[in-house]
Amino acid sequence: MTKKILLLLCKGFEVMEFTPFVDVMGWAREDDNNEDKADIQVVTCGLYNKMVTSTFGVKVQVDVLLGEVVKSLDEFDALAIPGGFENYSFYEEAYSEDVSQLIRDFDSKGKHIASVCVAALALGKSGILKGRNATTYRNSLREHSVRQQQLRDFGANVIADQSIVIDKNVITSYNPQTAPYVAFELLSRLSDENKAKKVKTLMGF
């Protein structure tokens, strides 16, 4: 049975946090053992433009716009959101009501939500992290994390020194390096732990 991930790209997203979802699920589909393949489709989604410009200027053409799929969200099993840079206008879209409503829709149905780095702040803005464990970007060169404090201000219980935090259906992480591991965790949830371990080994992790 095919599973589907809606991979939301907000303006100013980080490429390093986007590509692991595509690669990990692609490797899962291409397993040499036909009986062991995980049929997980990744559908890239933009808010308002089919061509989304990332942090540092890489442009990605998405499969769909949110307005085109908003009435068919029941087809999707998970939502994934990479983070991005404030000075590349990431929060303009990530904090929009359209994104907040999308996040609330997935959470209300108990569907998996995977965020990388500061994308957790979009989850916080939506209200779904109040009273829940989560994390977000932590600058190891500074004593205090501005982003983690912002997440606290949204009502989250921030686990400051844990790279990936899972609370029920929600996965959050604290820097770009965690992106592949968030993708592996999502694969484990959409298929099984053994499949995720196998793909991780095949990819050299």
Swiss-Prot record:
It holds the Pfam family DJ-1_PfpI. Keywords: Chaperone. It comes from the Eukaryota. The keyword Chaperone applies. InterPro entries: Class_I_gatase-like, DJ-1/PfpI, Prot/Nucl_acid_deglycase. One of its GO terms (cellular component) is cytoplasm. Disulfide bonds: none annotated. One of its GO terms (biological process) is positive regulation of phagocytosis. Belongs to the peptidase C56 family. Protects cells against oxidative stress and cell death. This is Protein DJ-1 homolog. The lineage of its organism: Eukaryota, Amoebozoa, Evosea, Eumycetozoa, Dictyostelia.
